[in-house]
Swiss-Prot record:
The active site is at 260. Catalyzes the conversion of oxaloacetate (OAA) to phosphoenolpyruvate (PEP), the rate-limiting step in the metabolic pathway that produces glucose from lactate and other precursors derived from the citric acid cycle. Its EC number is 4.1.1.32. GO terms for cellular component: cytosol. Binds 1 Mn(2+) ion per subunit. Pfam families: PEPCK_GTP, PEPCK_N. This is Phosphoenolpyruvate carboxykinase [GTP]. Keywords: Cytoplasm, Decarboxylase, Gluconeogenesis, GTP-binding, Lyase, Manganese, Metal-binding, Nucleotide-binding. It catalyses: oxaloacetate + GTP = phosphoenolpyruvate + GDP + CO2. Belongs to the phosphoenolpyruvate carboxykinase [GTP] family. Its cofactor is Mn(2+). Pathway: Carbohydrate biosynthesis; gluconeogenesis. The gene is pckG.
Length: 604
């Protein structure tokens, strides 16, 4: 079937016209022409990912003042609206006529009417930008094609950093995900993000914050989760990182809610992904790739001592977009928690700023955007079309009172259900609302869940049953506090928990059986603290960190059981696994009381 490009004649450049003609993709042309007709831009720039396209987009970002050039070569800064600083949960909808627990839905016809009304003529007086990308390594079993349309050069610049340009891969009538964004008038009351799963299309308007506007980031995750569940693989909010053991590199995926340790964990080994993972069973083995080739990371708290790899990226020439940090008068940047001297004045997302105002210089959800190739710890297989074999899965939370620093699950089912599906974590600044409220957030993906948790978990359990080699599952918690509200661990201690997990993967160390999983022996951690961090690890510290608060674990298990018992399609395995854990906890409470020291468990 020959593609009809007549609707685009005279609207796009001759070069773009000929290139689109060459790939013969009617669905793509239809999508472009309909979006142009809806949004009525003055001009359309079709970016094919060539160097001159990338340079043009960067130039336009500066000309439109969506970005400002900084003194370091390649560095720019972007400011979002003061009320558009994080993912907008309340303005984000899955378009479906179903009512889905924990999912913000809107009837599809109603949502489309509202969205198309907001987008109508939204690009008048502006230039439209079109980009073509692949989520995952190009021409691989993992690759998913996507098209972004936007009137924001900052958005398309971000996507050129974060994703693989892949125009040539659209040859023929290949399916692709569709993303339409307009900054509109930045009327926050009319900010809307709507995900039409049925048509694999996401609409976004009156916002520029990347989590709401960069389509291939978390907006695409809703579409790829749906695709994964329907096809029997996993699309996850997970880092992928390689950790060295005595038998070579072991790759782990790591799921943490935003701002809870995912990026810092991904910097402890060889980096493949800091945020997202496509995971498939290939010949009975669990393999994963990064859909992205860049990082959109939280910058608050990044300092030279704790985060040397990221610090280096942010202080050398190269492509970096800072967002919502402080810009100093000399074209430098400052962010809270950087542990450098705070400047006297500058400019941030609220306008002119002075130290004497007492206000924070940067937003707690301020970000940086950089290509993976800028990171010194980048793994050689970061773009391997075959992916990497996954030996372990980490589910981490920000839990101040209950979970011990590290636990290993008894099995795939036990780990998926009592660790991953039971995650509760304190809310962070990455979402709009009150911080430090404990939230149910299974697999750290609830914000991006487009379907029933029951269906999602059933796919997880089925996926595990199809594996011949099953990764071990671990619970991590870097944020446990004592009764005086002081953290029980330093930032660097996470290196030890990782080392212990690697030793468990290599079957090099035993562990203590508890009702909630396996925990480390003191002697093993003492050796690891010495060899990894060069510091002494006391029995007192170990006991404080690994004493199991049985009553609190029981309360948590009962909370989670209640949640899943009220979801109609929850697999029976979920309830049975949680009930078995509850029974074990009741048995231990009967034997030991509300708490039990790990030393008591060793003696028993």
């Amino acid at each position: 079937m020959k593609v009809d490009l007549s609707p685009l004649n005279g609207i796009i450049s001759d070069k773009a016209f000929q290139k689109l003609k060459s790939i013969n993709n009617p669905s793509l042309v239809h999508f472009l022409s309909k979006t142009i007709e809806l949004t009525t831009p003055d001009r359309v720039y079709v970016s094919f990912g060539e160097e001159k396209d990338r340079e043009y987009v960067k130039k336009r970002a500066l000309e439109t003042k969506e970005e400002i050039k900084l003194k370091m070569e390649g560095h720019t800064i972007h400011f979002d609206h003061p009320l558009d600083q994080a993912r907008a949960r309340e303005d984000t909808f899955i378009l479906t006529d179903e009512k889905i627990p924990f999912v913000n839905t809107k009837p599809r016809d109603e949502g489309l009417r509202e969205m198309l009304s907001l987008l109508k003529g939204s690009m008048k007086g502006r230039e439209m930008y079109v980009g073509f990308y692949s989520l995952g390594p190009r021409n691989s079993k993992f690759s998913i094609l996507a098209v972004q349309i936007t009137d924001s050069p900052y958005v398309i610049h971000s996507e050129n950093i974060l994703y693989r340009n892949a125009f040539e891969d659209f040859y023929g009538d290949k399916p692709f995900l569709k993303f339409i964004h307009s900054k509109g008038q930045l009327d926050i009351k009319k900010r809307r993000i709507m995900i039409d799963v049925k048509e694999n299309t996401v609409y976004s308007v009156n916002t520029t914050y990347a989590g709401n506007s960069v389509g291939l980031k978390k907006l695409a995750l809703r579409l790829t989760v749906t695709k994964a569940v329907n096809e029997g693989w996993l699309s996850e909010h997970m880092a992928i990182v390689g950790f060295e053991g005595n038998r070579g590199t072991h790759y782990f995926t790591a799921s943490f809610p935003s701002g809870s340790g995912k990026t810092s964990t991904s910097m402890l080994g060889s980096l493949i992904s800091d945020d997202l993972a496509f995971i498939k069973e290939i010949d009975g083995v669990c393999r994963a790739v990064n859909p992205e080739i860049g990082i959109f990371g939280i910058i608050q708290g990044i300092n030279e001592r704790d985060d040397p790899v990221i610090w280096d990226v942010l202080h050398k020439p190269g492509e970096v977009i800072f967002s919502n940090v402080l810009m100093t008068d000399d074209g430098g940047v400052y962010w809270e928690g950087s542990e450098v001297e705070k400047p006297e004045k500058g400019y941030n997302y609220e306008g002119a700023w002075t130290k004497e105002s007492g206000k924070p210089a940067s937003h707690p959800n301020a970000r940086f955007t950089s290509p993976l190739t800028s990171f010194s710890n980048l793994d050689k297989d970061y773009d391997n079309p075959q992916g990497v074999v996954i030996d372990g899965i980490i589910f981490g939370v920000r839990d101040y009172s209950t979970l011990v620093p590290v636990t290993e699950a008894f099995s795939w089912e036990h780990g998926v259900i009592t660790i991953g599906a039971s995650m509760e974590s304190s809310r962070t600044s990455a979402v709009i609302g009150k911080a430090d409220v404990l939230e149910f957030n299974p697999m750290a993906i609830l914000d991006f869940m487009p379907l029933s948790l029951g269906k999602y978990l059933n796919n997880y359990l089925t996926f595990g049953r199809n594996l011949k080699y099953v990764p071990k599952i671990f619970s991590f918690n870097y944020f446990l506090k004592d009764e005086n509200n002081k953290f029980l661990n330093s930032k660097e201690d996470k290196r030890v928990w990782v080392k212990w997990a690697v030793k468990r993967v290599e079957s090099e160390t035993d562990a203590i059986y508890t009702p909630v999983g396996f925990i480390p022996y003191y002697e093993d951690l003492s050796k690891l603290f010495n060899s990894t961090l060069g510091k002494q690890y006391t029995k007192e510290a170990y006991e404080l960190q690994f004493t199991l608060k049985l009553s609190k674990y029981l309360e948590k298990t009962e909370r989670i059981m209640k949640i899943y018992s009220e979801i109609a399609d929850t697999p029976i395995e979920v309830i049975n696994e949680l009930k078995a854990q509850k029974d074990r906890l009741l048995d231990y409470i009967n034997r030991y009381g509300d708490k039990v020291s790990p030393f008591q468990l060793v003696k028993s």
